[in-house]
Regions:
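Non-catalytic accessory regions of SAM-dependent methyltransferases
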Residues: 15-146
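Rossmann-like S-adenosyl-L-methionine
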Residues: 202, 206-427
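A short, charged
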Residues: 105, 109, 113-117, 121, ...
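Non-catalytic substrate-recognition/targeting regions of SAM-dependent transferases
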Residues: 132-143, 162-233
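Short Gly/Ser/Thr- and charged-rich N-terminal loops/segments
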Residues: 2-10, 21-23
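Short histidine-centered catalytic/ligand-binding loop motif
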Residues: 92-101, 150-162
Length: 427
């Protein structure tokens, strides 16, 4: 399929599902994958990944991306998943029912269930409709920005089902009166290289304006779904941004790693008297400034380009103090072997942030790395408080928004940790 992706802009979309159905029929395989003795406990407890070193034998022929049947060492059927020998995650499970066909009806059920869940849990005007493993569609992300969809395929098997799923997404949303006017593919994550797949950024179907205005928590943003980070916007912090509104009225606020100005603008709309947003990216600062103007907050919320690690010591040396400091850094680690260095980074930035908070003010701090787990992140914050000679009173602890559900049997689905603390000087 990858050979045709670069040509998809403006193509006729009307036969997409029929073509994809044909591909899906070829996607099924009679291949049986048998696991080693003692392996398979993760799958039996609800996990979705089988690694290359867990497999004993493969019987039958297949192509990468095909659906195969998985047995445990004793020959007990464990379900079906798609296989890719280019990936260390050799099989991603699609169903634990060995007799269940992974066809269009199956995919429609998965998409429908994902959408019904969002309707019951979040504001769906802009939200993550499909969150990979947590929606039992491993390797697939689908974000809705008003009437635009952005899809991302991170696994080969899902890549081969992509066009069917896009068609089903449109159908399911249309049942609720939502007409999708455009779909853009943002399959440009590094994970694709591990799957042996090329980077893809392109329209699926007719071209459209890729700058989309959304409204979240009463704040307007212009989202660039083509060139913005991830799929264009960080939807996972939606309700964490709302949470900081309660502590920002009439306050002086510093928002670090502001990106598009999301936390800063939530502070501004809540009635903060002065908000400063910092980000190392000139492009991000430009976007944030435009968003401030869009919301009529340009006189209250200001942004400038700066390296936060360099700027915070300068602010401390200048005697600056803030009622609220917000720390929303990028992931300092994306692998287990870099956790120690990441902990140093989180510790340093939290020390710097705490020192800028007025006595009795507030610190909002978070980590978006799965590998920086709750225990390590909490430990780092405590160490930072000791080093900064501050006492912390926890206001609340939060995770990612409910449209990024945490599947307890898939620990990789839990990644965002978000705290609000009151910061008190040692006395």
């Amino acid at each position: 399929m990858s050979g045709g992706q670069a040509e998809c802009a403006g193509r006729d979309d009307s036969k997409k599902i029929e073509l994809a159905e044909g591909e899906q029929e070829q996607n099924m395989s009679n291949t049986i994958v048998t696991l080693k003795k003692g392996e398979g406990r993760t799958i039996k407890s609800g996990g979705l990944w089988i690694y290359d070193n867990e497999i004993a034998t493969i019987t039958g022929t297949f192509k990468n991306g095909d659906i195969v049947l998985v047995h445990d060492f004793d020959g007990y059927p464990m379900g079906r998943g798609f296989i890719n020998q280019n990936s260390k995650i050799r099989i991603r499970m699609m169903t634990r029912k060995a007799d269940q066909e992974v066809n269009e009806a199956f995919l429609r059920m998965r998409v429908k269930n994902a959408w019904e869940y969002r309707k019951n849990t979040v504001d769906t005007s802009s939200c993550r409709v499909i969150f990979g493993e947590a929606d039992f569609l491993p390797g697939l992300v689908a974000d809705k920005y008003e009437n635009v969809l952005v899809v991302q395929c991170l696994a080969l098997g899902m890549e081969r089902m992509k066009e069917t799923i896009v068609g089903l997404l449109k159908e399911v949303l249309a049942e609720d009166g939502i007409e999708i006017i455009g779909v853009y593919e943002r399959s440009d994550a590094k994970e694709r290289k591990k799957e042996g797949m090329p980077i893809v950024k392109d329209f699926i179907g007719p071209e459209f304006d890729t700058n989309v205005e959304i409204v979240e928590n009463g704040v307007k943003y212009l989202v660039d779904v083509k060139d913005g980070q991830k799929t264009g916007f960080f939807l996972d912090q939606k309700y964490n941004r709302l949470a900081i509104q309660r502590i920002c009225k009439d306050k002086r606020v510093l928002d670090c790693f502001t990106h598009m100005g999301t936390f800063a603008l939530n502070a501004g709309i809540a009635g903060a008297k002065e908000v400063t947003g910092l980000d190392i990216s000139e492009y991000a600062v430009q976007q944030a400034t435009e968003n401030a103007i869009r919301n009529g907050l340009q006189d209250v919320v200001k942004f400038w380009a700066a390296d936060v690690f360099d700027e915070l010591p300068k602010l401390e040396a200048a005697g600056e103090k803030y009622d609220v400091v917000i720390l929303d850094p990028p992931a300092f680690t994306k692998a287990k072997n870099t956790i120690k260095n990441a902990m140093k980074g989180y510790r340093e930035i939290n020390i710097r942030g705490m020192k800028l908070v007025k006595d009795g003010g507030f610190l909002a701090t978070c980590s978006c790395s799965h590998y920086m787990d709750y225990e390590n992140f909490t430990k780092v914050i405590h160490q930072a408080a000791v080093s900064a000679h501050k006492r912390l009173r926890q206001v609340e602890f939060r995770t990612q928004a409910a449209d990024h559900p945490i599947l307890w049997s898939a620990e990789e689905s839990y990644y965002l940790k978000f705290y609000i603390f009151q910061v008190v000087d040692e006395k």
